[in-house]
Amino acid sequence: LGGAVAAAVGLPSAAAARAPFRPGDTVGIKLNCLAGRLLSPRLELVEAFVDLVASAGVDRDRIIVFERSSRELERAGFVIRRSGGPYLCYGTDNQWDPEPSTSGSIGSCYAREVSTTCSALISFGVVKDHDLSGVSAGIKNWYGVIHNPNKYHGSNCNPYLADVVRHPFIAGKLRLTVLDGVEAQCQGGPAYYPG
């Protein structure tokens, strides 16, 4: 995994792949678990990535694996931990900023993990399509941090995908996008479609 990240960021070694992270960071790893266990990031890969982030000197209690709901994480096989453990893991569970903010064409309340808690973000999704936006390679994952994603699916999510991600809460903190490609889906997403 370290070698893959090193190649993706153009650095010569797995050790150099830790460069995007600093010991003082609070790192949020936003998963995409909407499709349940069969089409979500594999627990083993997520935990290997947590180890990579920790090896950069980030305290494990400052590594937050999160999704829009604890229920989705549990359905994908993750254990909810708001304290202790090798890393924190929980859903935002409707804990939005009290006031909306805007970015381009969108106005939304963002999850506190991206607005105030985390100083560095990682999108960790799976290789799959979305029936309206197509394949976004992790960009659509960020719809899970706004309170009203249903409003932003028109015109194949254009320009809304870009507007959500270019908000300073995300654009100023996004260090990596990682996709689990062990299981891929090219039609029928975002839910798991066995056909």
Positions of PLM-derived features:
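Extended, low-polarity segments enriched in aliphatic/aromatic residues
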Residues: 1-26, 34-47, 51-195
